[in-house]
Swiss-Prot record:
The keyword Zinc does not apply. Its main location: secreted. It is found in: Secreted. The modification Phenylalanine amide is found at F64. The gene is flp-24. It comes from Caenorhabditis elegans. Belongs to the FARP (FMRFamide related peptide) family. Residues 26-51, 68-69 form a propeptide. Keywords: Amidation, Cleavage on pair of basic residues, Neuropeptide, Secreted, Signal. The lineage of its organism: Eukaryota, Metazoa, Ecdysozoa, Nematoda, Chromadorea. GO terms for biological process: neuropeptide signaling pathway. One of its GO terms (cellular component) is extracellular region. This is FMRFamide-like neuropeptides 24.
């Protein structure tokens, strides 16, 4: 069994490692190209791949034969 002192030292070290990991993640430098609004939605290497549009509710009703009453 670990003594109380040893377990508290391990806990303190784990907390310090977690704080350092969070601080390191927050300091990541991004390229200027990645800060464009388009970068939030797709990666640059995808290029201009034509994406399917999402069908509207009206399109789905026509497709499945639903009629308004």
């Amino acid at each position: 069994m670990l003594s109380s002192r040893t377990s508290s030292i391990i806990l303190i070290l784990a907390i310090l490692v977690a704080i350092m990991a969070v601080a390191q993640c927050r300091n990541i430098q991004y390229d200027v190209e990645e800060m464009t609004p388009e970068a939030a939605f797709r990666y640059a290497q995808w290029g201009e791949i034509p994406h399917k549009r999402v069908p509207s509710a009206g399109d789905m009703m026509v497709r499945f034969g639903k009629r308004s009453i």
